Amino acid sequence: MRLLLVVANLLAIIALLLVGYSDLLQPEAWPKLSNVGLLMPAVILANLVFLVLWILLRPRLLWLPVAGLLLAFVPIRQYTPFNPTEEPPHGALKLLSWNVAMFEGYVTKEGEKSEMMRYLLDSDADFICLQEATDKGDSLSPLKLLRHKYAYTAFIPKASETGHGLFLASRYPILSHDSIPYHSPGNMSVDFLVDVGGQKVCIINNHLQSYGISEKEREDFHHILQGDVEADTARIETLQLIEKLSKGTTRRAAQVRMVAARIQQRLKEGLPVIACGDFNDTPISYTHRTLSKGLTDCYIASGNGPGRSFNRNGIYTRIDHILCSDFFKPYGAKVDDSIHTSDHYPIFCWLEMRPKP
């Protein structure tokens, strides 16, 4: 029995390492394996179970799960960081990013602001970056209300049937904006140049390719995880899901490289860079590793816990991110799960400007 447990523990450690470092795989070369980062919560949990088992059954073997967890410390911290609480200093900039799902949760009575709108207006953010925003044009439209509050705004629609796009509300002048050229019918990234007290800052707002999974497919996946589906059906649906995930990941990879090239260009120009938005990918992914090269993940540096930002069945991870260059020090990053008017939760943090001498 003990030998079986040891073997099972070793397999759990191997799975943790393979999943944890799967962000090294390029999606075009490894389309199916590059998605295993989605399993990170499951493999962490499995290794924690062995930690508890050895404490109870055989403390002398406690070193085995501890060694596995230490070997995977970096990806575990990427997935679920823990940081001491630090108050943001006076003058730090607050940035909020949110996929608002075309404001589908925006419901108002005559003359009344919705919960979604109150949240945005009360956020007191210096920068609000929205994805899947729509400009409805009526007197209570979200973007019109934000334009009343913020001196500088820009809405860049996507040329598609939905008419949604990316939006930036800023307390500081927006000098220019430039869409990053990659082919996609429903996704886009925009490079905004903002003047913050004489310092030019690049803010890249992103809505990258999704996995393309429908609500029903997410619910089916949730039932599979719970063991509520017959084995044959579960196998077929799982294979179909893996195929769909692979296609979405491969398409996203091409977009990611275009955005990463723009980030590196801006860094070479000596500009402070913030890249944020709906990356549609987890902290354990090619997307995250490629985009965060030369940048700091604000949530990993100053947030706590897994920070699940997509709130529908089956996806238990953070797919919305804020990255910054070393011109900034991040504080208090948080995924705010108190508001449920979109299929994403907003993510925000404070950024202290620290110009180089």
Locations of the language-model features?
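N-terminal targeting/secretion presequences
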Residues: 59-60
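N-terminal capping/interface segment
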Residues: 1-10, 129-137
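Structured beta-strand-rich core segments of catalytic domains in phosphoester-bond hydrolases
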Residues: 65, 69-91, 107-108, 117, ...
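Acidic/histidine-rich helix-loop elements
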Residues: 97-113, 212-249
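Structural motif corresponding to alpha-helix initiation and N-cap regions
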Residues: 30, 110-114, 140, 316
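Active-site beta-strand/loop signature of hydrolases that rely on acidic residues for catalysis
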Residues: 94-100, 116-140, 156, 202-207, ...
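Metal-dependent phosphoester-hydrolase catalytic domains
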Residues: 2-16, 21-54, 63-67, 178-180, ...
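Short, solvent-exposed loop/turn segments at secondary-structure junctions
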Residues: 101-103, 135, 172-174, 208-211, ...
